From Swiss-Prot:
Statement: the UniProt record of this protein carries the keyword Cytoplasm: yes
Keywords: Cytoplasm, Exonuclease, Hydrolase, Nuclease
One Pfam family from the record: Exonuc_VII_L
CDD domains, per the entry: ExoVII_LU_OBF (cd04489)
Residues making up the signal peptide according to the UniProt record: none
GO biological process terms held by the UniProt record: DNA catabolic process
InterPro entries, per the entry: Exonuc_VII_L, Exonuc_VII_lsu_C, OB-fold_nuc-bd_dom
Species annotation: Bartonella tribocorum (strain CIP 105476 / IBS 506)
Family classification: Belongs to the XseA family.
Full protein name: Exodeoxyribonuclease 7 large subunit
């Protein structure tokens, strides 16, 4: 620092520096003076890791605030993820950021300030979720008795998945789907939540079958190791799941928030496998036992009803005794029917004989003639009616023809019939009288008209009309 000041002294006692020189000098002083430090404070402004994987937040107490940064490589190695409001002890190097004239700590290790801080945070979350009703027993779903497919959310390389698969294979071999996740570290909570949501999003008839049950499992560990299963995203994903979920996180004494929201909590991953599937051999023994009991019950029922049938048969009369009375009645009815037929035959024969005596050939001929007379009368009447109808049709045709040729129809169309004094029609101009009266006949009456103009004068005013030929017919 002395060398820097001595180099920049020029004629006065005030040193002159560039901004970069001052910032660099301060950075070197801070880093050389403090080196690695341990800082206790409360995390503030944490919003999760950046897209680059780095995390930026601040450590504060009641009087001061210190900016902090965790690089991506360190974030992936943390035993528990940072959370807003958590009191921690950060280990790292103090440095400055020349671009904004800030000093900060680059964290290389981060630990909560004892288990008490984590337990306080855990209890606060537990109380919050309980008030929202996420832990209600009435909302938990029943587990399927014999699932076809089981989905397991755990690490694919740990002993947990081997124990689960081995236990399921021993009890009831079936299809197991594994969704690999990190079960410890910064991203464990988000990965477990995504796995639960992913299993629920599978199609029932898709290429990857949808499981009937989900097991979320992890081995034992410290509170920090299991902290990812206390993540809010995990709790809400399990609560929103349509598939029943068994939680098997840690040992029997380890409780996480997923254990409260899951539909069933198993003390160990092996216990989860035992709860998920029954023992196939026990089912076979049970089915065999039920089959044997069913066969014995059917045999006893058959024997009982057979004994009742034998007892009833002993109480019944023999076939001869049973049919003797009906047979006697049948014989009596047969004999009575035969006698009745004979009597009826004799009566009919006597009746026919009496009718025969009453009949004679002359009477038969008279009846035959009457039948012929009736038949001829009917035929004559029908012929007469046909003739009458034929004449009526001809008369109607003549009437229609007469009506069509009548001059009355012509008068109705607006024509006038001119009649002379002798009441004969005037057909030609030459027949028109030179003086006197004529009669004009309309369709609805006659009118008398006197001719005042001489016939010769009337003829000269009109063009001569060609007289019709003699072979032309007349309407009158």
């Amino acid at each position: 620092m002395v060398n820097l000041l001595s180099e920049k002294t020029s004629g006065t006692n005030v040193a002159e520096f560039t901004v970069s020189e001052i910032a660099g000098a301060l950075k070197r002083v801070v880093e050389e003076k403090f080196g690695y430090v341990r800082v206790r404070g409360e995390i503030s402004g944490y919003r999760g890791a950046h897209a680059s994987g780095h995390a930026y937040f601040a450590l504060k107490d009641d009087k001061a605030r210190l900016e902090a940064v965790i690089w991506r490589g360190v974030m992936e190695k943390l035993k528990f993820p940072p959370e807003e409001g958590m009191e921690v002890v950060a280990v790292g190097k103090l440095t400055t950021y020349p671009g904004s004239s800030k000093y900060q700590i680059v964290i290389e290790a981060l630990e909560p300030t004892g288990v008490g801080a984590l337990m306080t945070l855990l209890e606060n979350r537990k109380k919050k979720f309980a008030e929202e009703g996420l832990f209600d027993e009435a909302k938990k779903k029943p587990l399927p008795y014999m699932p076809r497919i089981i989905g397991v959310v755990t690490s694919p390389t740990g002993a947990v998945i081997r124990d689960i698969i081995h236990r399921i294979s021993d009890r009831f071999p079936l299809h197991v789907l594994v969704w690999p996740v990190r079960v410890q570290g910064e991203t464990s909570g988000s990965e477990v939540a995504a796995a639960v949501e992913g299993f629920n999003a599978l199609a029932s008839e898709g290429h990857i079958p949808k499981p009937d049950l989900i097991i979320v499992a992890r081995g034992g560990g410290s509170l920090e190791d299991l902290w990812g299963f206390n993540d809010e995203a995990v709790v809400r994903a399990v609560y929103a799941s349509d598939l029943p979920i068994i939680s098997a996180v840690g040992h029997e004494t380890d409780w996480t928030l997923i254990d409260y929201v899951a539909d069933w909590r198993a003390p160990t991953p092996t216990g989860a496998a035992e709860k998920a599937v029954p023992v196939k051999l026990d089912l076979e023994v049970c089915v065999a036992s039920l089959g044997a009991r069913l066969r014995k019950g059917l045999a006893r029922s058959f024997d009982f009803h057979q004994q009742k049938l034998c007892a009833a048969r002993r109480g019944l009369p023999s076939a001869d005794q049973l049919f003797s009375l009906p047979r006697r009645g049948f014989d009596e009815i047969s004999s009575r029917l035969q006698r009745a037929l004979c009597v009826s035959y004799d009566k009919k024969r006597f009746s026919f004989h009496a009718l025969h005596l009453r009949l004679s050939p002359r009477l038969l001929k008279s009846e035959k003639a009457q039948r012929h007379t009736k038949e001829y009368t009917a035929r004559l009447y029908r012929a007469f009616m046909r003739s009458v109808e034929k004449k009526r049709s001809a008369l109607e045709l003549a009437c229609r023809l007469l009506k069509s040729t009548s001059y009355q129809n012509i008068l109705e169309r607006g024509f006038v019939l001119v009649l002379g004094q002798n009441h004969k029609p005037i057909k030609r101009l030459a027949q028109f009288p030179e003086s006197g009266q004529i009669n004009l006949r309309f369709f609805d009456g006659d009118i008398h008209v006197a001719t005042q103009e001489p016939f010769s004068a009337a003829r000269s005013k009109h063009k001569k009309i060609k007289s019709p030929s003699d072979d032309q017919g007349t309407l009158f």
